Amino acid sequence: IIIHEYGHGISNRSNPGGTGCLGNSEQAGEGWSDYLGLMLTQNWATALPGDGFNPPRGIGTYALNQPNNGPGIRPARYCTDFAVNNYTYSNIGAMAVPHGVGFVFCTALWEMTWELINDPSTTGIDPNIYNFAGTGGNVVALRLVMEGLRTQQCNPGFISARNAIMRADTTLYSGSHACAILRAF
């Protein structure tokens, strides 16, 4: 939860429009915050390329006195296994704003991370998530999300936030990860 809340500060202050620029019905603020929580608490030193579905990750488990692998506060745990988390963009119309919509956005970001880890355009997993010069899919994913935040339009929706990630890929990596990004979204 602490990293999640810190993530709100990052997303609100990284957006070019400032702190009042993330308020529409498709805003992904909760998603970026969940994503940062997942990325910064994942043990990348022991993670394997197939771990996107093992184990599924809940958010807020500690606050609910659940074990680390508990369901947490979202409609499903974050996981690339569609049998565990089958939420997609088509579900956002029925999701609560902002937490439900953000959950769906984070689901896509988590899927993108594991697509990049398993894509031949990266070197799999970098055990050091803070190595922004690294070519591991986890590092590439975090860099793309952060650059997308910094360059997206004011009041981005789900699609425009994704498009900002695509532009970040073009800027940072000459678009070499476009297919992996689109598979996730």
Predicted ranges, named:
Residues 1-185:
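Extracellular protease catalytic domains of secreted zymogens
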